[in-house]
Every structure is written in structure tokens, then in C-alpha cells.
Amino acid sequence: MIQLNKILVPTDFSDFGKPAIAYACAIAARFEAELHLLNVVPDQAMLVPEVAAFSPESMQAQSESLVREAQRQLAVLPGDDWENGKAIVRQVRTGPAAIEIIEYAKAENIDLIVIGTHGRSGLMHILMGSVAESVVRNAPCPVLTVKPEGHQFVTL
């Protein structure tokens, strides 16, 4: 029988990620698994092409501000979806999202990653890439992708 002890939900706090959190909570409750919520703050160099124009102190302050905001938002998740008595692990990392998600999954021995998709296709997908796709291709464990639209998950 499959046993899931640790479930990871990477989130960017967008509406696209909310269904993934609901799915992960339901699965975690079913398996009495520990839930890991992860937000990855992009590296400053990834956010601002003119990064050389900013002082290191300014960049550090901005990065710290983004991390604090991410921690604040993680603190209220998963909200009412969580009915399991198990612990919730909340983590913020900085760097490229897909790489940080995969490294976290390896380091924490995650059994399942549940990740939302943005539903981009065509040119937008080519230009912007897909964190979910990269995670699916490189994760050390199974990955469940959850589309933002479609079937609603109902717990019984």
C-alpha cells in the first residue's frame, strides 16, 4: 500500500495555487501526512534586469521584505482546508522556483508534490516556461498537477 508521510505544496499565493492547496490538504488528511507549504521568492537579479543600478544594501532590504511578506502569507495557509492534526511546515526560500522546490523535496524526503498550474499554452508557455513542468520532469517523487479550472474537489 502506498504511504504518504510528507506532502509538499509549493505556492506563489496566486489564485492558480488555491486548488492545489485544497487537494493537498485532502490527501494529507486521508494519509495523516505532514503538510509542507513552500514559497520561493525570486532572486533579486531575476526580478530586476537593472540590478547593477541598486546598492547591495537596497537589494538586501528588498529581498528581506519579500521574504517577510511571504512568511506572513504562509502563516495563514492552508486556512479552513486543514483538518488534519499533523504539523504544518512552512518554508520560504530564495532562488529559481523549480530548482528550490526540487531541492526542498530531496532534502525533506517529500513523498508527493502537489503543484498548481497556470494553464499557459502556446507562445506564453514558450516565453515564460513552466515551473510545474520543470518540477514534474526533475522531482525525486511523484507530482500531482492541479489545473485552476475544472472539477472541484469534494471531500466525503
Positions of predicted regions on the chain:
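Short, well-ordered secondary-structure micro-motifs
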Residues: A20, L47-E50, I102-E103, I126-L127, ...
